[in-house]
Amino acid sequence: MIKDIFFDQVKPAYGCTEPIAVALSTATAKKYLNETLEDLKEINITLDKNTYKNGLVVNIPGTNIFGLEIAAALGYLCGIPEKGLEVLKDVNSQCLSKATNLKNKIKIEINDMPYLYVETIAVSKDNHTVKILIEGKHDNIAKITIDSNTILDKPFNPSKTTLENIKKYSIDEIIDYVENPDKEVLDYVEKAIEMNIDIAKYGMQMKGNFSNAAINEYVKYVSAGVDARMSGVLKPVMTVAGSGNQGLSCILPIATKREEYDKEKILKATLLSILVTIYIKAYTGLLTPICGAGSISAAGSAAGLTYLKGGNRQQIKNAINDTIGTLFGLTCDGAKRGCALKAVTGTLTAIQVSELAINNIDVPCGNGIVAKDVEETIRRVGKLTNSVKQFDKDVLDYIGKC
């Protein structure tokens, strides 16, 4: 059911979700190893290249520090694993001080896994070990092994995830659901709007924030929200398909028009934006070489904005098609403050495309990757995303180096 997919893919998180996945793994390891900092020998972490890429230069929530080692240390020292993606909600200065010392005991390597992969092995000085494996999704703890005793084993199958289930639906069927959604889904959309507007307002007060790059109030919210999140502001963001930046970029362009439209229309348009974003991510994968905030969620917000303005189904599909045709190829070179500017680019395109769609102006099929049927365009995006994965390896040579 679409409702189940929605609740699986729309969750609050503190901080960038890739280092948060690392923090969740070490927090879970601490829960079972139960050793103090003094009695801990080492923590060895293995990551897929995309998780590694997105954790290199993004600030960790509640700190002015970036790096996967500090995320891992904070997770071990003060993370609350039961809170999932909100694992670092209670970070404080005392914990941060200890984490700086723990960094020296943490080693990180990368592998070639094609999906999100976080393996943490914590070892005590008396050689007890706890192994935690997170696979496929930022909060999916797939395996827990204490010494040689496996107490949890849920093998990850990429073809049998909740995200994959959305491929069973067409865009028309998604619009059908948006027209008659479950009440609890709309209530949750309202919560998502309030949460993401809150961090955006905070971001606008930050000195030197990137919202100054925005040319109108609506785009300012997106830029400020992303900037605040990437800067490590200790506030929650409602994520969409594993990404807070996607959540901000597909929710705020519509939510900030609350004064212009009735509440139900805003909620339904926002829901459509969220579901279209999830739909496209099902084909590209959660972690990809393609920018989610600047490209994929822009297609979602273009659909939502077109719906909000009274666009018909074909106009909504054209808006998705045209956004993909315009922005596909905008790459992800890691999570960072500069993502705010990519989100601005995506939001401005979504606004322009929705206006064109309402006026029945669209990119003809056959222009580039744009197909007649929007679902085919999205399938092409998935195939092409897989074809440029070498980028993810090569870009690691440059991130963090001036």
From Swiss-Prot:
Superkingdom of the organism of origin: Bacteria
Pfam families: SDH_alpha (PF03313)
GO molecular function: L-cysteine desulfhydrase activity
InterPro entries, per database record: Ser_deHydtase-like_asu, UPF0597
Stretches of the chain forming a coiled coil according to its record: none
Regions crossing the membrane: none
GO BP terms: L-cysteine catabolic process to pyruvate
HAMAP family the record matches: UPF0597
The family this protein is said to belong to: Belongs to the UPF0597 family.
Protein name: UPF0597 protein THA_1286
Species of origin: Thermosipho africanus (strain TCF52B)
